[in-house]
């Protein structure tokens, strides 16, 4: 016979390992901040590649907040609030390495934070 305490302990263990999940619209600011965090980290890691892309595509502009976040190694998330969702999407998907590098990293970061997205 299984004791109630064993069942309770098992349920508690499962609950402790299960992460809370949240479903948000792709344009939600929390989603944008995760995306921008990955983007800033990717720029830092591949700065020369982004410089080359900028030279080849001078009309692709970035908000000043992105540059400030890239070169400020403290907590930059508050700098990135207020960037319009369509601008976030344009910047992130506008680079050739979006599908191979950014998209998987963004998906991983959202999943790690328990965030799942739905189309707007």
UniProtKB/Swiss-Prot annotation:
Mod. after translation:
O-glycosylated.
GO CC, sorted alphabetically, is: extracellular region; fungal-type cell wall
Protein keywords: Cell wall, Cell wall biogenesis/degradation, Glycoprotein, Secreted, Signal
Q: Which GO terms describe its biological process?
A: fungal-type cell wall organization
Q: Which Pfam families does the record cross-reference, listed alphabetically?
A: SRP1_TIP1
Gene Ontology MF, one? structural constituent of cell wall
Q: For this UniProt entry, which residues form the secretion signal?
A: 1-20
Localisation = Secreted, Cell wall
Q: Which InterPro entries match?
A: SRP1_TIP1, Yeast_SRP1/TIP1_CWP
The record's induction entry says:
Induced during anaerobic growth and completely repressed during aerobic growth.
Q: Does the keyword Phosphoprotein apply?
A: no
Instruction: Note whether Signal occurs among the keywords.
Output: yes
Domain of life, source organism: Eukaryota
Similarity comment: Belongs to the SRP1/TIP1 family. Seripauperin subfamily.
What is the documented function of this protein? Component of the cell wall.
UniProt protein name: Seripauperin-24
Q: What is the protein's species of origin? A: Saccharomyces cerevisiae (strain ATCC 204508 / S288c) (Baker's yeast)
User: Gene name, please?
Assistant: PAU24
